[in-house]
Design a protein with these regions (language model features):
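Core alpha/beta catalytic barrel or barrel-like domain that forms the active/cofactor pocket
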Residues: 3-6, 45, 110
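Long, hydrophobic/aromatic-enriched structural stretches that serve as scaffold segments
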Residues: 1-26
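Residue-level detector of short, conserved catalytic/binding motifs and their immediate flanks
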Residues: 6, 29, 114
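Sequence/fold signature of self-assembling virion shell proteins
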Residues: 64-104, 110-115, 121-173
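Flexible, active-site-adjacent loop/turn segments at secondary-structure boundaries
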Residues: 2, 13, 53, 61, ...
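Alpha-helical scaffold segments that mediate packing/assembly in large oligomeric complexes
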Residues: 18-26, 33-97, 152
């Protein structure tokens, strides 16, 4: 656990001039905003540090890595071998990869994606990919398989505390 605290002080002059009601209310609102902001920044830190090798998990690897070691030997990846911008192909590949994730004994665990998490810069791309009934960016009349198959039943959410403009994440069940 981590204790986070912030406070404000009112001067004796403010008390004598009966300014404590007005100042106290304003400062209290500012403290509440500051705490809400801090909670969001700390919550987003897991994703913001997901590719940083300075922040490792129990296996000695960052959260998103191409070489998580398996107890039975071998490795497992939960990020693409080659970085890819968010588009139909990269999203389909990510969903396929998720469906073939394995446990520490290298057995498929049959995960499904439930929600995509994107920074503000990708919200329009995410909306087109998940809400269109037809394929995005083609003149063909093909269905949007991601939408049609309900591959991300909870849709997407925009996290305003993700500074990387092209990183996207998929929450699983």
């Amino acid at each position: 656990h981590e204790t986070i605290s912030l406070a404000f002080a009112l001067t004796e002059e403010a008390m004598e001039d009966n300014l404590y009601d007005r100042l106290g209310a304003r400062y209290t609102r500012a403290l509440a905003r500051s705490m809400a902001h801090t909670k969001q920044v700390k919550a987003a830190a897991t994703l913001n540090n997901a590719f940083d090798s300075s922040f490792t998990g129990g296996d000695g690897k960052e959260l998103c890595a191409t070489d998580h070691p398996l107890a039975g030997g071998g490795t497992f990846r939960n990020e693409p071998s080659t970085a890819a911008d968010l588009n139909e192909t990269s999203l389909e590949n990510a969903l396929i990869d998720i469906s073939t994730f394995v446990d520490e004994r290298n057995m498929i665990i049959a995960l499904r994606g439930t929600k995509m998490i994107v920074p503000p810069q990708l919200q329009f791309v995410a909306d087109r990919l998940l809400e269109s009934t037809l394929r995005v960016g083609t003149a063909d009349n093909d269905i949007n398989a991601i939408n049609n198959m309900g591959m991300l039943p909870d849709g997407y959410t925009v996290n305003h505390f993700l500074p990387d403009p092209d990183a996207f994440f998929i929450k699983t069940d």
